[in-house]
């Protein structure tokens, strides 16, 4: 959890009563119908008051307000992943605060008075709280003020019981990571190495071509919000799958295009997409191979474009599936 110096605490404290009053004014207002494709959990009367009828819990009473565990916060109503613990910070406002959300997991809606912006679970429309901009509490200048009662928490040790992983390789891992991390339902995208026999390889060993590894990205995703096929399609659209052992100006075996499947279903999806692209005139060279151990790359390679503010130099999204090849 992030630690911040809250020079705006007094201003925020003064707004508590106003915020709570505005939220409580919505109590009793039920919005939207349940979707048939979502499994809704049974809620307690208090959970329903907040999540369905847009109420709020009292400040400084929620179980996650100062909670600092490592893991993922999910929607109490449908279980969809909402926030990473790395994006939580102590705003001293009485409710859990986050300065970012998992891509596509949270949607925004203006309150009736036009003054505040409500945040809801993008999967089930469950009420989460409100989002505030411009407070300068963290570098993102964003604060998601969320009711603890609207969330559940999955500890990092239990993540693989609830979410899925996929491994893609398409040139320099910086660019692949950048675009996949921004995809809906992706909880994390990690740059690393796979395909070789050397244990815990270094970047230099991979570049030497002696390790047998290639640059790859491991994606942790929420199956409630996206699918393996959607991610694989995105992968084929953010790199050129027709280039052999290279991607743009980056040349070498470590930059080859590959999908590492974890089961027969993933293999079938990957092979289907390769056939679709070949049918459109692309000569796809992407290898479809069984997944082997993935090794996380050095810290300097993680979130490279997010940290530097630069843009990928050898990856450019192209709509390959919907548009015919020119």
Where are these regions (language model features)?
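Flexible coil/turn and secondary-structure edge motifs
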Residues: 23-326
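Hydrophobic helical h-region of N-terminal Sec-dependent signal peptides
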Residues: 13-24
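Bacterial N-terminal signal peptides that target proteins for export
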Residues: 2-15
């Amino acid at each position: 959890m992030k630690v911040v110096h809250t020079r705006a605490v007094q201003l925020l404290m003064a707004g508590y009563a106003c915020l709570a009053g505005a939220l409580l004014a919505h109590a009793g207002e039920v919005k939207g119908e349940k979707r048939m494709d979502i499994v809704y959990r049974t809620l307690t009367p208090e959970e329903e008051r907040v999540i369905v009828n847009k109420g709020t819990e009292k400040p400084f009473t929620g179980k996650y307000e100062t909670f600092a565990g490592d893991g993922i916060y999910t929607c109490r109503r449908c279980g969809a992943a909402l926030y990473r613990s790395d994006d939580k910070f102590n705003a001293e406002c009485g409710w859990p605060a986050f300065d970012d959300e998992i891509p596509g997991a949270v949607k925004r809606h203006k309150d009736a008075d036009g003054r505040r912006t409500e945040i809801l679970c993008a999967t089930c429309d469950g009420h989460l709280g409100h989002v505030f901009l411009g407070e300068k509490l963290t570098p993102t200048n964003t604060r998601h003020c969320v009711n603890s009662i609207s969330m559940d928490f999955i500890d990092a040790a239990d993540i693989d019981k609830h979410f899925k992983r996929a491994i893609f390789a398409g040139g320099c891992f910086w660019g692949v990571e950048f675009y996949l991390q921004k995809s809906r339902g992706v909880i994390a995208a990690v740059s690393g190495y796979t395909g070789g026999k050397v244990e815990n390889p270094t970047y230099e060993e991979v570049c030497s071509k002696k390790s047998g590894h290639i640059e790859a990205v491991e994606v942790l995703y929420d199956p409630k919000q996206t699918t393996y096929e959607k991610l694989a399609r995105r992968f084929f659209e953010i790199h050129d799958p027709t280039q052999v052992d290279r991607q743009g100006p980056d040349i070498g075996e470590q930059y080859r295009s590959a999908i590492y499947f974890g089961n027969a279903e993933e293999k079938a999806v990957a092979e289907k997409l390769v056939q679709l692209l070949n049918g459109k005139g692309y000569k796809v060279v992407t290898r479809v191979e069984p997944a082997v151990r993935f090794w996380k790359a050095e810290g300097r390679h993680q979130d490279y474009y997010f940290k530097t503010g630069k843009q990928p130099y050898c990856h450019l999204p192209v709509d390959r599936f919907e548009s015919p090849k020119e």
